[in-house]
Amino acid sequence: MCRIFNIVFLMVFTLPMFGQDKAELMAQVLQTAKDYRDIAPVMGIIKQNGQVFKYVPSISPLMERYRISDYFGYRIHPINKTKQFHSGVDLAVTYAATVHATADGKIILAGNMAGYGKTVVIRHKYGFKTQYSHLTYIYCTVGQEVGKGCVIGFAGSTGISTGNHLHYEIVKNNKKINPLNFMLWNSETN
């Protein structure tokens, strides 16, 4: 329930919604969502109040099966063995698995990034940016507009990496936030 509350709070109070008082909408959503399994009805209520979901990272960047190999937050770095903040999630996946844009946006970086190897960064509306790193191949160019679900690259192990995976980050108003809170939405609820 806490995760749903965080997502709903972000959606209702920081994104422009239309036609309904925000406090009333929040009450309706929280009454509908009894626990985390009730995300589909919650998304339905919010979707009725604006076309924001195209621009909010709300699907997994990988459609193939993956394993979360490292979480958002402090961790012991797997290579230099020091405690460091990990600003995204690492999703272990097969080599060259397709990587998808998690929201509509514009490519602002498509190239090498120190430590991250081949990386794509997308700027979305409402202060969101997403980063996709350690790619084996980039399938987009700077300045290109992409839609939610479009293929932007293929997973790999470039940069400082211990194996094939995707490092995925979400930034909201220049603050890195936990991507798992957004990845729980699936394509049927968007």
Per-region residue spans from a language model:
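Short glycine/threonine/proline-enriched tight-turn/helix- or strand-capping micro-motif at secondary-structure
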Residues: 46-53, 69-100
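Short coil/loop residues immediately preceding or within conserved phosphate-binding loops
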Residues: 63, 86-88, 96, 102, ...
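A structural signal for short beta-strand/turn segments enriched in small hydrophobics and glycine
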Residues: 99, 105-107, 143-155
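Short hydrophobic beta/alpha edge segments that flank linear recognition/processing sites
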Residues: 91, 119-122, 147-161
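Polar/charged, compositionally biased leader and regulatory segments
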Residues: 2-6, 15-75
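A residue-level detector for short acidic-glycine micro-motifs
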Residues: 70, 93, 109, 134-137, ...
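Acidic, glycine-rich catalytic/binding loops that coordinate metals and/or anionic ligands
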Residues: 21-27, 31-34, 141-142, 148-150, ...
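Zn2+-dependent peptidoglycan hydrolase active-site motif and core
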Residues: 84-86, 101-139
